[in-house]
Structure formats: structure tokens, C-alpha cells
């Protein structure tokens, strides 16, 4: 079981992908995080690929937990958000102040201060264009939808996903429904209706993704499956005739052998390929909005590999010297880097003879996650493996680069303060 609130170390990514059905990242997005396979997995990324190829609208959704520092370890999610925004995605960002109150006891006032000072100003400084940033506690649409989603799940499911026990308070138990509503509310009618939605996450957040994807499907009238043929079934106990006829008419305009069955509440169609499913799902979702306010497309997700902390393990706010905060003074960041662990050998002679081990080196991770020059990063990797690079040189070089970047970010952060009203929606 994965705990999305307290995962403290690395995962066996391939085992998790097999166990929970996370697919390989198979769409070649032109961003270094994807090119370097730092984004290891995906769910339904074909919906985003379809939207891009057909010039359709799509949503980009993420959230922030206002409980600690924004650091390089969680920065890559925003790097992806900015990348997808440049491709045309409509960005929404939730400040999880209700979740931070329920799971970590942080007051709403403190959460607001942390969200703005530690996160939102940095997002803008990094290049995020105006978008919708909101606080859970002030968004009535999210609260309403969370209430409605509660009618589509039960305690047995939540115990299975999260390990909840009788000692967990109801606010904590409700937090996953709030998070599901954060993502799904972007497809409500007032926000433009059904649309592909991508959520960049770490593997530790997969329980949330599984729940919200299941909830999205349960809110639909139509359920779509491809067996030997396409099967569109109608959920519920109401008379299905109107829905069956609508799906039948739609599919008959595209395929030749289409049959409907009122008794079994299904429409079947031959000759449908796997690649047709995305378009069919999107079309039926839009048709369904005539009858259903919650005709959601199950959200897509990208799964990123965790960044190593400078003291080993994953980069985490619980070990201050293991992370580089985006609010760190450049001198402090330099100190942390120079004191960081490496993948080097015990002596210079061994390093030259045996080569270093960049794959387990936190210093190399700084290059890999933060430097967009593919050629230089590959050169650093190869020279380390071949014993041509010493750890001290790498530390000094990346410390200089990070100090310069943090200094520039600090200036942009102050400029961003004047633009907050373009982002925060209340």
C-alpha cells in the first residue's frame, strides 16, 4: 500500500507500474524531463496526445500542499505544468489548505501565507502564465462536487486504498474526495465541460489518481469497453431507451455493424480499433452533458521519478540539508551542494581507474533535473563514468549554476508579487 501523505523513500518503479497498471511513457513530448526518462509512467496520456493532434482544448491540473518549502524535488511537476501550458493547456492549481489542515494541522491562515510566499510566487517567477489558482476552503464548486462524489464511494474502498482505520478523523478521510473534486471540477459545465485533463504526479500520489479515475467513470451515464467489439453500456436503473438511441445513432454514423439491446442496456459496434476509443469517449461525454452535469473524462497522469536528496534518500522537507529550496539564499544552496553526497569513489585514483557512479549520485541529479542542455548533461554523465570528471569539479560547476539561477529567481519573485491578482481566483 502506498501512503500519499508520508512516503519517505524511493519505490521499485517497475513493480509499481506492473502492480497498479501504470503504463510506460510512450508519447515523445519534447521536454528534457521526458527525453531523459525522468517521467517514467502514465495513465491515459493518449487523451492528451489526441487533444494536441486534433487541436482540442485540454486541462492541466496540479495542487500544492502548503506545509513546507518548495524545493527542486517537487519543482518538476510545475516544469511540466508550464510545458503543457505552452502547448495550449488550460491550467488550474489547487492550494490544498483543507487537506493540510486535516492531515497536518496547519491553519488556513498559515497555509495561505506559505502557499503564496513559498510556492505561487515561484511558479510565476519560473514562467507560469496567468491561470486559475484557488484555495480549497474558498471554492464552493470543489466542496459541492466532493459532496456529490461521496455518494460514489464507501469506507471499504477508502480503507483498501489508504489504510484508513477507526482512529482517522472524518476530515482526513474526506481529503481524497476533495482532491478528486479539485481535478474533476475543471470539467463541470461552467468551466467548459468534458475535456482531457493531465495531472503530473509522483508515484506516491497514485492512490489519489486511481480513486479519481474510478469516480469519474462512476459519474458517467455511458461506460465504454472494447472487447471483441465495442460495447457502450448505460449505467443506472432508469429507462435507457433515450441514451441507447443516442449512442446507436452516433455509432451508426461511423460504423456499419451496430446493434442495440434495450434489455441489456448496451450498444455494440464491430470494426472499432483501440485508437478510436478516445474520440468516441470524448464525443459521447459531450453528448451526455445534455442529461448529466458530471460527464467527466477520467483524468490522465504523468508519473515522475523522485529526485535524490543531497544527503541520500529522496529530496524532502523533513531533511533540510538534503534539499535546495527555491527560496534558499544562493550561498546557502552552495553550502548544501558542496557538503552533499556523491556517486564518486573513495579516492581520486580509484575514480580515474574505475569511473564514478552518476546513476546513484545526488549531484548528478541536479544536472539531470535542472539543466536543459542535453549535450552537456550527457557529457557530464559519460565523463563521470569514464573517470574523466572529479566530484569536486562537478560540485563547483553545478553550485555556480544553481546559485546564479536562484539569484535570478529571487529577483523575478519580487516582480511576480505585483501580478498575483492575475492568478489567484477567490
Swiss-Prot record:
<keyword id="KW-0963">Cytoplasm</keyword>
<keyword id="KW-0436">Ligase</keyword>
<feature type="short sequence motif" description="'KMSKS' region">
    <location>
        <begin position="314"/>
        <end position="318"/>
    </location>
</feature>
<keyword id="KW-0067">ATP-binding</keyword>
<dbReference type="InterPro" id="IPR002305">
    <property type="entry name" value="aa-tRNA-synth_Ic"/>
</dbReference>
<dbReference type="InterPro" id="IPR002306">
    <property type="entry name" value="Trp-tRNA-ligase"/>
</dbReference>
<dbReference type="InterPro" id="IPR020653">
    <property type="entry name" value="Tryptophan-tRNA-ligase_arc"/>
</dbReference>
<keyword id="KW-0648">Protein biosynthesis</keyword>
<dbReference type="GO" id="GO:0004830">
    <property type="term" value="F:tryptophan-tRNA ligase activity"/>
</dbReference>
<feature type="short sequence motif" description="'HIGH' region">
    <location>
        <begin position="66"/>
        <end position="74"/>
    </location>
</feature>
<keyword id="KW-0547">Nucleotide-binding</keyword>
<dbReference type="GO" id="GO:0005737">
    <property type="term" value="C:cytoplasm"/>
</dbReference>
<dbReference type="GO" id="GO:0006436">
    <property type="term" value="P:tryptophanyl-tRNA aminoacylation"/>
</dbReference>
<protein>
    <recommendedName>
        <fullName>Tryptophan--tRNA ligase</fullName>
        <ecNumber>6.1.1.2</ecNumber>
    </recommendedName>
</protein>
<dbReference type="Pfam" id="PF00579">
    <property type="entry name" value="tRNA-synt_1b"/>
</dbReference>
<comment type="similarity">
    <text>Belongs to the class-I aminoacyl-tRNA synthetase family.</text>
</comment>
<dbReference type="GO" id="GO:0005524">
    <property type="term" value="F:ATP binding"/>
</dbReference>
<keyword id="KW-0030">Aminoacyl-tRNA synthetase</keyword>
<dbReference type="InterPro" id="IPR014729">
    <property type="entry name" value="Rossmann-like_a/b/a_fold"/>
</dbReference>
Amino acid at each position: 500500500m502506498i501512503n500519499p501523505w508520508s512516503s519517505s523513500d524511493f519505490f521499485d518503479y517497475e513493480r509499481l507500474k506492473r502492480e497498479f497498471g501504470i503504463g510506460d511513457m510512450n508519447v515523445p513530448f519534447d521536454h528534457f524531463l521526458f527525453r531523459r526518462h525522468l517521467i517514467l509512467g502514465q495513465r491515459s496520456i493518449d487523451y492528451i496526445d489526441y487533444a494536441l493532434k486534433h487541436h482540442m482544448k485540454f486541462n492541466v491540473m496540479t495542487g500544492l500542499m502548503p506545509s513546507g518549502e518548495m524545493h527542486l524535488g517537487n519543482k518538476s511537476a510545475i516544469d511540466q505544468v508550464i510545458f503543457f501550458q505552452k502547448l495550449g493547456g488550460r491550467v488550474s492549481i489547487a492550494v490544498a489548505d483543507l487537506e493540510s489542515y486535516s492531515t497536518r494541522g496547519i491553519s488556513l491562515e498559515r497555509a495561505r501565507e506559505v502557499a503564496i510566499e513559498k510556492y505561487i510566487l515561484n511558479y510565476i517567477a519560473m514562467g507560469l502564465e496567468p491561470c486559475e489558482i484557488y484555495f480549497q476552503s474558498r471554492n464552493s464548486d470543489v466542496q459541492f462536487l466532493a459532496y456529490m462524489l461521496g455518494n460514489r464511494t464507501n469506507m471499504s474502498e477508502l480503507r483498501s486504498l489508504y489504510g484508513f482505520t477507526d482512529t482517522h478523523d472524518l476530515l482526513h478521510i474526506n481529503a481524497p474526495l476533495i482532491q478528486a473534486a479539485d481535478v474533476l471540477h475543471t470539467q463541470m459545465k461552467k468551466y467548459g465541460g468534458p475535456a482531457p485533463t493531465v495531472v503530473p504526479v509522483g508515484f506516491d500520489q497514485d492512490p489519489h489518481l486511481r480513486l479519481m479515475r474510478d469516480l469519474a467513470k462512476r459519474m458517467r451515464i455511458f461506460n465504454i469497453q472494447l472487447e471483441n467489439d465495442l460495447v457502450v453500456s448505460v449505467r443506472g436503473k432508469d429507462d435507457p431507451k433515450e441514451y441507447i438511441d443516442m449512442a446507436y445513432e452516433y455509432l451508426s454514423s461511423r460504423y456499419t455493424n451496430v446493434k442495440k439491446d434495450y434489455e441489456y442496456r448496451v450498444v455494440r459496434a464491430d470494426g472499432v480499433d483501440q485508437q478510436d476509443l478516445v474520440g468516441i469517449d470524448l464525443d459521447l461525454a459531450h453528448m451526455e452533458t445534455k442529461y448529466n452535469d458530471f460527464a467527466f473524462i477520467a483524468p490522465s497522469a504523468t508519473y515522475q521519478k523522485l529526485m535524490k536528496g543531497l544527503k541520500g534518500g529522496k529530496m524532502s522537507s523533513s531533511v533540510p540539508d538534503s534539499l535546495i529550496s527555491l527560496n534558499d539564499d544562493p550561498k546557502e544552496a552552495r553550502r548544501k551542494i558542496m557538503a552533499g553526497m556523491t556517486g564518486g569513489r573513495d579516492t581520486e585514483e580509484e575514480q580515474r581507474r574505475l569511473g564514478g557512479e552518476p546513476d546513484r549520485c545526488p549531484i548528478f541529479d541536479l544536472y539531470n533535473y535542472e539543466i536543459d542542455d542535453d549535450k552537456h548533461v550527457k557529457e557530464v554523465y559519460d565523463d563521470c563514468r569514464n573517470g574523466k570528471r572529479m566530484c569536486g569539479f562537478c560540485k563547483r560547476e553545478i553550485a555556480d549554476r544553481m546559485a546564479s539561477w536562484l539569484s535570478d529567481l529571487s529577483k523575478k519573485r519580487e516582480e511576480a508579487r505585483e501580478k498575483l491578482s492575475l492568478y489567484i481566483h477567490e
